[in-house]
Amino acid sequence: MASNTPVCDFGWQAVDFELEDTHASRHTLASLRGPNGLLLMFICNHCPYVKAVIDRICRDARDLQALGIGVAAIMSNDPVEYPEDSMENMQRVAEQLAFSFPYLHDTTQAVARAYGAVCTPDFFGFNQQLQLQYRGRLDASGRLPAGPHVRRELFEAMREVAATGHGPR
């Protein structure tokens, strides 16, 4: 699995899908999109990087939702290969961390392949027309705790998308 996200393909059109969340509700791009865009995050329960940054992911998701950005997380791993990523464990994690966003299960990995997701977490930020405007990291701290001066790169980029429809280049 790659450890770095590829360069953003600005303007790439989001691929539609329909996936079930941890509450057995089904979601599509249209149902997830906020008035100012959409952030899709490929995450999983077992990844040490996700575990290290999940509190910051939750914070940024709440802050972006307040700006009219829809947010969803997608888990595409095979739970047979990674038992920690089972639906039951997805439900437990979403509840324990009080996810403010749907946590979707991509059982066939078709959505991950369609998006070219290569690592976890992998962030895809779209404008209101569902054109890709951000593909990058959460911040520069990686798995380390974020210090007080660490830029919130994902949040800042998506705030720009919410305000202008365009991400940073």
Functional labels for PLM-detected ranges:
Residues 1-163, 167-169:
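Chalcogenol-based redox active-site neighborhoods
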